[in-house]
Amino acid sequence: MTLTYTAPGGEYSRLYADMATRPHLLIAGKTGSGKTTTVNGILHALLCSTTPAETRLILIDLKMIELQDYKRLPHVHRYADDGPTALEALNEALNITLARYADMQRRHVKRYDGSHLFVVIDEMADLLTAKATRDKATELIQRLCQIGRGARVHVIGCTQHIPTIPTSIRCNFDNRVALRTVNANDSKNIMYSPGAEALPDPVTQHKAMCYYVTSSGPVLYDLPMVPDDEMARVLDYWTHPARQIA
């Protein structure tokens, strides 16, 4: 999966998030830092480069607003917008993962060669802290992260409450995008070093940037925004099959 981020004066003109070798992505930053913009960019990239046969989506939208525009897409396997349905969706994702491993065992192959399944969780901390969902959500997300890679199952988790994400969960996310954080400690929790707290504030400075964490350290990128009319065009294309034929 390729995310086209511009690196101002940096060494990269394009950010390539390798979801094959680093299958899970954690996006973290304070309120208004650009998490929704980042997720929209990822989903836009997937919708523009893959078909529903190649990419399946499970969307967990506890705010009931950030991901609702996508729920009618043919790519979407399941959409959940509260705690109980979120747990059902995570459990279904795990069952799909286990079924894929059973299929690989029957066919004597080591890597699943079917569609990619992306489990996108908006405000993952809510699931991991609420008493009604905490224990089961932690168990399911951790298990998905541990075994998802070989089955082409990917978890994309977003949060503004970085310290509340257990270390046992965080350590499974090798792919990380750090947006502006409240303080240096939050920056260290997401990208192992301070710096994200000093990123421009998109609300007051009208400029959004992020750090993408690489094996050699964090790299600074501009955060692109998919225009509303462009996203509407892509959503319209996939939700009106007749227009695809035309």
Question: Could you describe each region identified by the protein language model?
Answer:
Residues 1-185, 191-193, 198-202, 211-216, ...:
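P-loop NTPase catalytic phosphate-binding loop
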Residues 246:
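Phosphate-handling catalytic cores of nucleic-acid transaction enzymes
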